[in-house]
Amino acid sequence: MSEDHGKDYTLEADSELRFEIEQKDAKVLVSLVSGFAELFGTELVKKKQYEFGMGAKVAIFTYQGCVLHVSGKMDVCYISKETPMVQYVNCHAALEQFRMEAEEKDRHGPVAMVVGPMDVGKSTLCRILLNYAVRVGRRPLYADLDVGQGSIAIAGSVATILIERPANVEEGFAKTAPLVYHFGHKSPSGNSILYNAVVSKMAEVTLHSLNSNKRTKSSGIIVNTCGWVKGSGYAHLLHAAKAYGACAIFVLDQERLYNELLRDVPKGVHVVLLPKSGGVVERSKELRHEARDQRIKEYFYGNARAPFYPFSFEVKFQDLRLYKIGAPPLPDSCMPIGMKAEDNKTKVVAVTPTPALIHHVLALSFAESVEDEVIGTNVAGFCCVTEVDMERQAVMLLSPQPRPLPPNALLLWSELQFMDNHT
């Protein structure tokens, strides 16, 4: 294929063009020549050119047939007629039925959870269902419980946003005014008790916020989950389903999980087994780590289309109110009377700055003091420790906002690290 002139691909009805870009600095341009096509539920505009870069794994689907013009260097590119999109649109139709009933009776709309192991396309299915909902005039909420990657905020947090318009083809959903809660670990296993507490709090606030707008109330919530589905991971899924009052659970590509949920969730919950798309690519541990890093980098620096210019400034140790949620475990014999070992998992403890703090991402909490409900308080944003100077008793912070930190700023430690080598 010539990189300069590109190639036209003719797709029949109910088929999709899939391509992947793995090479650094590679750029692929796509335009819809004729017909109708969509990317994960967002309609492509005819003759408009869309640009994709390194790491893109794209599947452009057509219900009626179309011609696409593609130019640039791809590692994989093919047309597939084997696609689960018809099943996915049926799920949307079922949710829409629930929404119409909720609208008539002035009730909360459906809460649908998407579950499955890693790399089966959970985030993509969420995006498709949200886009379809918006295209028929709904305003659903999107809750992301995947602390390993984070599609709304960065990894190590859970977050919710209101979806008012379809996702941008190249950049995804607008991340305007997200509700973000700090967890501080890359997996729920980092602190299972804290994870459940944070999920419960966000579910409570999210369900309450459905009442703020009639259209949102009947539109409901789409919930994305972690890829840990065995043992304690499965227990977290059951906890989330209960906390959100899920009425539908879409299980991607795992019959065992489907049957376990059929057995364990209340009878009124619809559990549906769905195939994953053949275009879903399994990611190595290194690729997942790179994706996490890229999300943090974009948080501070934006991207080529919309660059950000963060600030670096110094904060003295004496002005740094830094805490961590979760104290080291103690034997029961050492615990104060009436306190359980699990209580330590949600205890807020002060962190003394040391060189070990360098590169760690910190969350800026809206809580004003540790006496406040820190776990149940959302965060304003994130900063990163780029230097620790023990002689001068100061740290250097990378922040989206200029100095100083807000008065009484309370920072929360995270195990996430970011090497700021941006040039």
From Swiss-Prot:
It comes from the Eukaryota. Its main location: nucleus. CDD domains: SIMIBI. InterPro entries: Clp1, Clp1/Grc3, Clp1_C, Clp1_C_sf, Clp1_N, Clp1_N_sf, CLP1_P, P-loop_NTPase. GO terms for molecular function: ATP binding; polynucleotide 5'-hydroxyl-kinase activity. GO terms for cellular component: mRNA cleavage factor complex; tRNA-intron endonuclease complex. ATP binds at E16, K57, D119, V120, G121, K122, S123, T124. Keywords: ATP-binding, mRNA processing, Nucleotide-binding, Nucleus. Gene3D superfamilies: Clp1, DNA binding domain (2.60.120.1030), P-loop containing nucleotide triphosphate hydrolases (3.40.50.300), Pre-mRNA cleavage complex subunit Clp1, C-terminal domain (2.40.30.330). GO terms for biological process: mRNA 3'-end processing; tRNA splicing, via endonucleolytic cleavage and ligation. It is found in: Nucleus. Belongs to the Clp1 family. Clp1 subfamily. PANTHER family: CLEAVAGE/POLYADENYLATION FACTOR IA SUBUNIT CLP1P, POLYRIBONUCLEOTIDE 5'-HYDROXYL-KINASE CLP1. Required for endonucleolytic cleavage during polyadenylation-dependent pre-mRNA 3'-end formation. This is Protein CLP1 homolog. The lineage of its organism: Eukaryota, Metazoa, Ecdysozoa, Arthropoda, Hexapoda. The gene is cbc.
